[in-house]
């Protein structure tokens, strides 16, 4: 979890400690140790919860500065907290202990008919134009990430990026994206420190430690995108590139594409190359050990709060702010306030 005190913007709270309880006390969100028998009951009916002596408080956050709470595994909520979350528009996202997305609680106030109506009315051509912008950015960012690590000979990625402009269907675009991903991942091994190797992308389950970290980071970043989409009243399940499937947040996966190389993969290689995570930190099933998972979540949150110069707006933003900005641009493109969607691209 974040530090117990401090002012923060667009705040996302991560609760990873097993056996904890999220409640409210006055104007603050309070995370308590549920294993303490003196902790307040989850079925408490009052709109707030009184302080109790002897209860270990693990963290507190100003309620008005929190817009998203992410919980992992065995974490419970009090009834008063859920009532406050509904009133305050706080989105709750549920994950397994090791980061698999399970579901969300989204207050009704987060839906606006006008925005959804425009989204549902998008033509196939408009959807393809949005998807092409996202995938072109993903391919360019992949080439940039490799170049920053000294990897040369990536002209094929450049050519595939240029090919995106000329595709005429989503299926054709998926083919180009798949070719680019294969080319990119075939060179990712060259960006890793000694003692680490990467051969090919594998999922469900990931077959090695690198793939495990990539999958976990994509889940975390997808949740950042999900949160932004919901806060801006877009339907995350109606995509423009990924095919619709029951329970799959296709639009979140679409927008995630441009962040995969520049944000996700860069974070994973940083953890590895700096020695923050080692092979000893994994279990036999390639999941992170519980204590290391908490460290991972803290590092990810800090990473999202790091600032960089936005290549399009030319001012400093955090990665979390950048995702929100891209979501705003996407919404404006969907509603017709912008003629085109400007994806996040890094040239160097």
Model-identified regions with their sequence ranges:
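A surface-exposed, charged beta-strand/loop segment in the N-terminal or early-internal portion
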Residues: 65-144
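Active-site helix-to-loop segments that bind/position phosphate- or nucleotide-bearing substrates
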Residues: 1-35, 42-48, 60, 111-348
């Amino acid at each position: 979890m974040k530090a117990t005190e401090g002012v923060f913007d667009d705040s996302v709270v991560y609760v990873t400690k097993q056996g904890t309880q999220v409640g409210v006390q006055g104007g603050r969100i309070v995370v308590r140790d549920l294993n303490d028998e003196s902790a307040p009951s989850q079925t408490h009916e009052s709109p707030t919860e009184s302080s109790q002596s002897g209860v270990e408080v693990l963290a507190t956050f100003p309620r008005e500065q929190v817009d998203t709470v992410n919980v992992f595994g065995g974490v419970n909520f009090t009834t008063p907290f859920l009532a406050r979350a509904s009133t305050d528009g706080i989105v709750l996202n549920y994950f397994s202990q090791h980061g698999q997305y399970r579901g969300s609680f989204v207050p009704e106030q987060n839906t606006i008919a006008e925005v959804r109506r425009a989204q549902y009315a998008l033509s196939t051509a408009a959807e393809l134009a949005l998807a092409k912008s996202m995938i072109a950015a993903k391919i360019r960012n992949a080439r940039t990430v490799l170049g920053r690590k000294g990897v040369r000979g990536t002209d094929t990625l450049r050519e595939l990026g240029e090919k995106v402009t000329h595709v005429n269907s989503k299926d054709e675009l998926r083919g180009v994206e798949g070719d680019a991903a294969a080319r990119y991942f075939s060179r990712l091994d060259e960006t890793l420190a000694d003692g680490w190797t990467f051969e090919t992308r594998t999922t469900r389950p990931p077959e090695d430690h690198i793939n495990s970290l990539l999958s976990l980071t994509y889940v975390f970043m997808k949740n950042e995108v999900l949160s932004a989409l919901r806060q801006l009243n877009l339907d995350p399940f109606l995509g423009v590139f990924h095919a619709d499937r029951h329970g799959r947040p296709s639009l979140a996966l679409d927008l995630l594409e441009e962040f995969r190389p520049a944000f996700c993969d860069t974070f994973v290689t940083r953890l590895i190359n700096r020695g923050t995570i080692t092979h000893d930190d994994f279990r036999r099933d390639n999941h992170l050990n519980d204590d290391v998972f908490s460290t991972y979540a803290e590092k990810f949150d800090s990473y999202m709060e790091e600032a960089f110069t936005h290549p399009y707006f030319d001012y400093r933003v955090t990665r979390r702010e950048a995702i929100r900005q891209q979501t705003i641009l996407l919404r404006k493109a969907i509603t017709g306030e912008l003629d085109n969607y400007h994806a996040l691209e890094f040239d160097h």
